[in-house]
Amino acid sequence: MLCRNTARTGCKFFRLYHSNPIEHVKPIHIKPLTYGKESPQYKVLSLALQKFVPEHGFSERSIVESLNELGYPSSMISSIGAPNSPSFFHSSTAVMELIKFQLVDKRYRLTEGINPDVTPQYKLPSLEHLLLKRLEMDKPIGGHLSELMSQLAIPSAFLFETAIPELHRLSDDMIYFSNEKDHHDSAWYAKRLAVSSTYIGSKLFMAQDKSHNYKETFTFAKDKLHRVMRLGEYYNNTEEFAWYTLMSTVNLIKSQLVRG
């Protein structure tokens, strides 16, 4: 296990068995996006997410509105979706890229300014703080979360190549950049499954939440995180706990989808 101040060179984008410093480098390109922050694609998708998705949802209209405002031709929408393979289950490769962009961009913005290499662990934010901060980022698109979660849950290459890997990267980052004590054995997986379960459950709750400023969502998230992490401490069999958290997530998704 490399220490956190290990020199970071030759980094490739893959997840190691444990959290590792080389995985959390802030690169010029925000992997797995294939374009940098100065590219037209990034600018179009960033503006679409900030200004037009809150009104029009994850749709081609949001992207076209962004293209128009930035002075790009509407035909550019085809190149925006180019990184994605056409899917029978998803109507637009450009919308798929917009969804991917919001997952990746928010994950990186969540930990901006946090450097575990130089910051004492006790001064790092709590896991709960990062979880709530990530949910806070979705307030502007709260009215479109049901649509988003439905898109992400469609069995497809996009689910297995983008949505699930990004969920695991987010969970890994929330633990790595927090003051949460990590484990370097099989419990590493259990903790990340617990955080993934909490995050997915909170997002599904948020999609149905009618309370002012999503107050009930944040109460739910704090309570669920506490219960899941505490339950993990009581399980001596890490594999059993990992299956418990995984099945909790699957069952919750199924119940929400049945409700429509």
From Swiss-Prot:
Pathway: Cofactor biosynthesis; ubiquinone biosynthesis
Mutagenesis or variant effect for residue 135 to E/K: Inability to grow on nonfermentable carbon sources
Keywords: Lipid-binding, Membrane, Mitochondrion, Mitochondrion inner membrane, Transit peptide, Ubiquinone biosynthesis
Reported effect, residue 189 to D/K: Impaired ability to grow on nonfermentable carbon sources
Any one Gene Ontology molecular-function term assigned to this protein's record: lipid binding
Keyword Glycoprotein assigned: no
A GO CC annotation given for this chain: mitochondrial inner membrane
GO biological process, one term: ubiquinone biosynthetic process
InterPro entries linked to this entry: COQ9_C (IPR013718), Ubiq_biosynth_COQ9 (IPR012762)
Family note: Belongs to the COQ9 family.
Name the record gives this protein: Ubiquinone biosynthesis protein COQ9, mitochondrial
